[in-house]
Amino acid sequence: MNMDKETEQTLNYLPLGQSDPFGNGNEGTIGDFLGRYCNNPQEISPLTLQSFSLNSQISENFPISGGIRFPPYPGQFGSDREFGSQPTTQESNKSSLLDPDSVSDRVHTTKSNSRKRKSIPSGNGKESPASSSLTASNSKVSGENGGSKGGKRSKQDVAGSSKNGVEKCDSKGDNKDDAKPPEAPKDYIHVRARRGQATDSHSLAERARREKISERMTLLQDLVPGCNRITGKAVMLDEIINYVQSLQRQVEFLSMKLATVNPRMEFNANASLSTEMIQPGESLTQSLYAMACSEQRLPSAYYSLGKNMPRFSDTQFPSNDGFVHTETPGFWENNDLQSIVQMGFGDILQQQSNNNNNNCSEPTLQMKLEP
């Protein structure tokens, strides 16, 4: 028979009834029946054809409306499990047509597979796209699980290797520390702390210096009369300077007086004045008393000569020890100086009358008389 491939495959999938028209007692398909009928038409009798209820079998499997409608190509369905396993190649069709034993085996397997639709199809049949998609998804899930496990394992391996590396580094560092001697701890001082120390030391030194200055100023205040009432340092210093200048003027005045009183006596007045000025507790009257004692030891001829000598009122005496020239009339007009001299000589005369033994020092005098 000349049939299309689709029709032939469809007939191969359609099962026969419970009775085999060939009398073998095995179930088969319509395709097998038609193939045998075409090859050996004499084997099939009209009685067997009548007993073969084709319409009933078709009506059980497929609904009939307006004639027989064969199911479409099995590849168009979602899966091959609805119809069981089937041969897909022409070689399987030819072998099934030639070998009746293989046909009976195939019919038995198709029947069992049709009853057990959930079983996996066996043979050379193609897998359905749904099963392939399921297997692919399962493989992907398993791959993801495996990948995640592999990632976890790799992370664990990396962590373990890092720990091992850290332990190795620590062991190396410990060995190096053991090899090197421990350094002494260094005392680090902040810059601000150093500046604070410097300022503290500077302030202490400044305080000590100011204390010394204040002590010396108090000593000067005690020496200068009337200086204790002054509070300001500048004013106090001015007062001390004025007092020292006044003392200097007094010393100059006394030296000039001595030069005018005894102009012809050349004794070591400078040495006596220096020794008298060095002694701090000696007063002016004591110095004059020493000078008077030296005059008493002079011979009586000096006094007689002095009385007979004329008074040089208008003459100027040469300066002694570099003092300024002064005139005698102006000098003797000073009442204060005359009173001081009279008081000194009066004290000397009283002491001479009371004390016969004089304790005055007798300096060596070199008297020179002018003709």
Swiss-Prot record:
Pfam families: HLH. InterPro entries: bHLH_dom (IPR011598), bHLH_ZIP_TF (IPR024097), HLH_DNA-bd_sf (IPR036638). GO terms for molecular function: DNA-binding transcription factor activity; protein dimerization activity; transcription cis-regulatory region binding. Keywords: DNA-binding, Nucleus, Transcription, Transcription regulation. Expressed constitutively in roots, leaves, stems, and flowers. It is found in: Nucleus. One of its GO terms (cellular component) is nucleus. Residues 165-190 have a biased composition (Basic and acidic residues). Residues 128-142 have a biased composition (Low complexity). Residues 1-25, 65-206, 352-371 are annotated as: Disordered. The keyword Transcription applies. Residues 197-247 form the bHLH domain. Residues 85-96 have a biased composition (Polar residues). GO terms for biological process: regulation of DNA-templated transcription. PANTHER family: STEROL REGULATORY ELEMENT-BINDING PROTEIN, TRANSCRIPTION FACTOR BHLH77. Homodimer. Interacts with IBH1. This is Transcription factor bHLH77.
